[in-house]
């Protein structure tokens, strides 16, 4: 089955089977869906890695804002998109390259590969598996991603200077310099421009 054919419920169920940080006693379903019926299916799909800016923006614009944040799932799939073991889901064009390449040096003495994830939230993580906690799950995923050599940038938008969302973004970032806290649209634009420049610098250095 191609990635485009996998809807969010199928991906959720598949990811659950490989979720190494699922706590004991947690089942594979959300405590509740934003809609009134617990039997409804999430309508959003996961888009594989792509350089198509127009398609990416259109996909993001298709997500409705319903006041809930399943941050652990966003973090989880950021990892899976970079993980070569998930190549059969995303397809050959979007398959993550081997982790070993990040420890191999090119002729300039630089890593042959950088795996980079950018996580953003505008609120606390408050949608989770029954019996689990989205914030705890997300932080554990971040720890494991960094252990694999993935560089994590985090961006908080209007999350204040303290609280669960702030702490999660701060802890998930690779270093304090990889954490951005934007209080308005202009600061958000600057944060992503700065991240883009840093990533571009890494590529140009090779």
Region roles according to the model:
Residues 1-115, 124-153, 158-163, 170, ...:
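Divalent-cation-coordinating short motifs within acidic/hydroxyl- or histidine-rich contexts, strongest
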Residues 164-169, 192-195:
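Short secondary-structure transition/capping segments
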Residues 117-119:
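Residue-level marker for buried hydrophobic side chains located in beta-strands
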Residues 177-206:
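C-terminal helix of von Willebrand factor
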């Amino acid at each position: 089955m191609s990635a485009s054919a996998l809807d969010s419920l199928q991906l959720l169920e598949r990811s659950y089977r490989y979720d190494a940080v699922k706590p004991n006693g947690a089942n594979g379903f959300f405590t509740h869906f934003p809609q009134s019926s617990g039997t409804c299916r999430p309508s959003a799909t996961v888009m594989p890695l792509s350089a198509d800016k127009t398609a990416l923006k259109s996909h993001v614009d298709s997500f409705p804002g319903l006041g809930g944040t399943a941050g652990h799932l966003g973090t989880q799939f950021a990892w899976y998109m970079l993980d070569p073991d998930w190549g059969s889901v995303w397809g050959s064009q979007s398959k993550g390259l081997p982790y070993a390449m990040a420890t191999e040096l090119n002729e300039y003495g630089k890593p042959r590969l950088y795996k980079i994830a950018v996580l953003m939230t505008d609120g606390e993580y408050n949608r989770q598996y029954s019996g689990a906690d989205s914030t705890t799950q997300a932080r554990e995923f971040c720890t494991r991603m960094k252990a694999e050599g993935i560089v994590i940038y985090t961006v908080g938008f209007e999350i204040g200077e303290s609280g669960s969302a702030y702490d999660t973004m701060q802890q998930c970032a690779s270093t304090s310099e990889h954490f951005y806290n934007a209080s308005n649209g202009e600061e958000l634009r600057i944060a992503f421009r700065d991240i883009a420049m840093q990533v571009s610098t890494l590529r140009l250095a090779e």
